[in-house]
UniProtKB/Swiss-Prot annotation:
Its EC number is 3.1.3.7. InterPro entries: CysQ, CysQ/Inositol_MonoPase, Inositol_monoP_metal-BS, Inositol_monophosphatase-like, Inositol_monophosphatase_CS. GO terms for biological process: 3'-phosphoadenosine 5'-phosphosulfate metabolic process; phosphatidylinositol phosphate biosynthetic process; sulfate assimilation. This is 3'(2'),5'-bisphosphate nucleotidase CysQ. The gene is cysQ. It catalyses: adenosine 3',5'-bisphosphate + H2O = AMP + phosphate. Mg(2+) 2 binds at D89, D92, D216. The keyword Hydrolase applies. Pfam families: Inositol_P.
């Protein structure tokens, strides 16, 4: 298995930056858009960067398989025995890319024994990169400024800050909160960028009551794990990785302060 160290992290960062440059080039022109079987959009940028990432990672780490959102039809029978693998989302926030909101990213995560252990989230237009590795910490790079992110404490002297997507029903989110619970919604693009905001304490949590894939959340597991945050499903159980036939996540909440009793806030049916 790969050794978790700064050299490995820097190799992955470089690949993420190279992928970001490709996304920038596609972003400057009109891209072809198609609908996938699940009715979500995919562009030529998704497909190109998926192939680029797969080739780069395979060339550097030939014994480590790659699972991409755009090539996720590998059978569970084949992948269930993987000891470690790369889980990638070449363009997290495809709809934001199409809508030209700048809020999209490339996401690379190393999963070992069903646990994400290294992650890089790079948003090229925002010049923002989040990266984390087990027992190393979580960092945010904005332009040339690098900051190590630390433990967050949820402050209930003010409204709860909840990150949601642009298409998320805020009333639906309110329905799982106590009646008249004070909160404010922060609308952000891709799932990975929302997880970065949770990790740095810009929001208290991110609620997702819609469909996502394991590639959308794996990176957040490392970011939040290193800053004492957490991700849980509607039963307050952790998400799983490569342990089921499906790669689709259940509904979930990401929180920046895992020490708080979130069961007293979120009231799932």
């Amino acid at each position: 298995m790969l050794t978790l160290n700064e050299h490995l992290l820097n190799q992955v960062l470089l690949i993420a930056y190279q992928s970001g440059k490709h996304l920038q080039q596609f972003y400057q022109k009109q891209v072809h858009v198609e609908l996938k079987e699940d009715n979500t959009p995919v562009t030529e940028a998704d497909l190109f960067v998926s192939q680029f990432l797969t080739e780069k990672l395979t060339a550097l780490f030939p014994n480590v398989p790659v699972l991409s959102e755009e090539n996720c039809h590998i059978s569970f029978e084949e992948r269930k025995n993987w000891k470690e693998y790369w889980l990638i989302d070449p363009l997290d926030g495809t709809q934001q890319f199409i809508n030209r909101t700048d809020q999209f990213s490339v996401l690379i995560t190393l999963v070992r024994k069903n646990k994400p252990v290294l992650s890089v989230i790079h948003a090229p237009i925002l010049s923002t990169t989040y990266y984390a590795m087990c027992d190393f910490g979580t960092f945010k790079k904005q332009l040339d400024q690098v900051k190590k992110l630390t433990k967050n404490t949820t402050n209930f002297d003010r409204p709860l800050r909840i990150a949601v997507g642009a298409t998320t029903s805020q009333e639906k989110v309110r329905s799982i909160l106590p009646k008249d619970f004070p909160c404010e919604f922060v609308v952000v693009g891709s799932s990975s960028l929302k997880s970065g905001l949770v990790a740095e304490g810009a929001v208290d949590c991110y609620v997702r009551l819609g469909q996502t894939g394991e590639w959308d959340t794996a990176g957040a597991e490392v970011l939040l794990g290193e800053t004492h945050g957490a991700i849980f499903d509607s039963h307050f159980e952790p998400l799983t990785y490569n342990q089921r036939e499906t790669l689709i996540n259940p509904h979930f909440v990401m929180v920046g302060d895992q020490s708080f009793d979130w069961r007293s806030i979120f009231q799932f049916n």
